[in-house]
């Protein structure tokens, strides 16, 4: 995929989009019964591990606070239309390609800025999931005048991008990973120590272990790491490690070994499964576990938050069951249920996505596909990353990448600045704050078209958050 320089290249973008849209304020309401149901579900699912059951089909609607929200984002006039790059990954099974639709959150930020007369030009490029491709993407964006770059992919191949960015003094924000964080590279992922603590607390909680134990130790809780070798999991004292593969023959051997380990009752406790791997591998492994009747709690990797994972899981009879959890940060649609400032800011994002989805003339970042095809998956990290660069470029005195990099390092942004789901503090290389913990689904993801074809659109679930307050960071 090449660039689409026409996106945002017309400084009158906001005028065209505003003319297509009505001027009335969008009001989002959630009925009392929905809020009550989600609260009950949150309490129930958040405190116990149960025999997994398929969750009820979602309605396809997005919950939001019952408040008036401001969709437009206005920044101080600079007299320039800044150029910001977004790197994503296209290609079947290419490393990081699972996050391509999530990256459309950056398109939402661009749209909101245009509504507020603060247009930005977005250059969008495919890194092909290779280290060389990532390097070439950054080099191309730099040559085209990008003042900052959002890395909306995930995986070791991003080292090519971060190396090239550092050579050119161009700031980058990794929306979904933490490769080479530091020295002009900011990350919205959990930092390694924070991730380790949250995993440990989550495992102990799922196992029903006492909260008075050490938050750094599993204290005898049985854990089995299902390692596909394609992802990463924190370095914890797992009871067992099992190499897994999506290959059918290998999966049979994996299930046989796992059944043997699960049958060992000597410790008197049921094990917690930790799954790592690509989106496609995790989906296929979970589907195989379900077919084999294995119902142990599973902590899946963050790839479970992507469309390819959900689509592959649902194919051929798989289900998003209530024993599946993900360690992560609060999600936009769940945050929108809150009545505080963060909830209102997240509601603005959710309502803008819905507004854009209903405008058939709007395209995604590529300029080729209708935004409606990816609307359901557009997320907070990519939105917040583009927004942060917009703020930085609005405050520089010199319109250079070096100046943007310096200013970005001084920024602290929160809901009042329209960040979604969590605040940002760029004095740290790990800039995302807010609450982290165990994400659990409250509604089953479903095929919008009702089929099982790989071309069908998929509706995501709403992932709620069970927090561990000691691990939250503001």
Spans of model-derived segments:
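Terminal targeting segments of Actinobacterial cell-envelope proteins
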Residues: 1-26
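Segments of small-molecule ligand-sensing domains
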Residues: 362-386, 390-452, 470-473
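Extracytoplasmic "Venus flytrap"
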Residues: 66-105, 113, 131, 374-376
């Amino acid at each position: 995929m090449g660039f689409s320089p026409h996106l945002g290249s017309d400084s009158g973008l906001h005028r065209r989009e505003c003319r297509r849209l009505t001027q009335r304020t969008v009001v989002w309401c959630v009925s009392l019964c929905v809020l009550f149901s989600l609260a009950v579900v949150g309490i129930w699912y958040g405190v116990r591990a149960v025999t997994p059951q398929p969750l009820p089909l979602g309605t396809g609607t997005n919950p939001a606070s019952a408040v008036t929200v401001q969709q437009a984002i206005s920044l101080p006039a600079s007299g320039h239309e800044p150029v910001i790059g977004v790197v994503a990954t296209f290609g079947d099974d290419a490393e990081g390609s699972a996050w391509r639709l999530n990256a459309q959150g950056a398109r939402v930020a661009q749209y909101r800025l245009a509504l507020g007369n603060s247009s930005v030009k977005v250059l969008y490029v495919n890194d092909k999931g290779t280290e060389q491709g990532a390097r070439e993407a950054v080099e191309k964006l730099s040559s085209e005048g990008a003042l900052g770059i959002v890395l909306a992919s995930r995986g070791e191949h991003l080292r090519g991008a971060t190396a090239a960015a550092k050579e050119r003094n161009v700031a980058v924000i990794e929306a979904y990973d933490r490769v080479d964080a530091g020295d002009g590279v900011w990350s919205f992922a959990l930092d390694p120590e924070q991730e380790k603590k949250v995993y440990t607390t989550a495992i102990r909680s799922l196992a029903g272990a006492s909260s008075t134990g050490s938050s750094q130790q599993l204290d005898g809780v049985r854990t089995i790491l299902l390692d596909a070798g394609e992802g990463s999991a924190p370095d914890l004292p797992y009871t067992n490690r099992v190499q897994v593969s999506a290959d059918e023959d290998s999966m049979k051997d994996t299930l046989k070994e796992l059944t043997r380990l699960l049958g060992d009752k000597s410790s008197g406790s049921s094990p917690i499964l930790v799954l790592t791997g690509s989106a496609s591998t995790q989906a296929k492994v979970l589907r195989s576990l379900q077919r084999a009747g294995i119902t142990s709690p599973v902590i899946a990797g963050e790839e479970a938050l992507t469309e390819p994972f959900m689509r592959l899981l649902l194919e051929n009879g798989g289900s998003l069951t209530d024993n599946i959890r993900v360690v992560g940060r609060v999600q936009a649609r769940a945050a929108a249920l809150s009545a505080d400032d963060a909830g209102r800011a997240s509601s603005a994002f959710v309502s803008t996505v819905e507004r854009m989805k209903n405008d058939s003339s709007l395209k995604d970042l590529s300029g080729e596909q209708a935004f409606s095809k990816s609307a359901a998956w557009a997320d907070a990290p990519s939105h917040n990353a583009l927004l942060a660069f917009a703020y930085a470029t609005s405050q520089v005195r010199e319109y250079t990448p070096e100046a943007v990099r310096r200013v970005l390092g001084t920024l602290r942004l929160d809901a009042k600045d329209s960040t979604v789901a969590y605040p940002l503090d760029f004095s740290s290389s790990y800039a995302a704050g807010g609450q982290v913990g165990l994400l659990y689904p409250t509604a089953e993801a479903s095929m919008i078209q009702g089929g099982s074809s790989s071309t069908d659109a998929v509706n995501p679930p709403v992932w709620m958050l069970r927090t561990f307050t000691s691990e939250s960071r503001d």
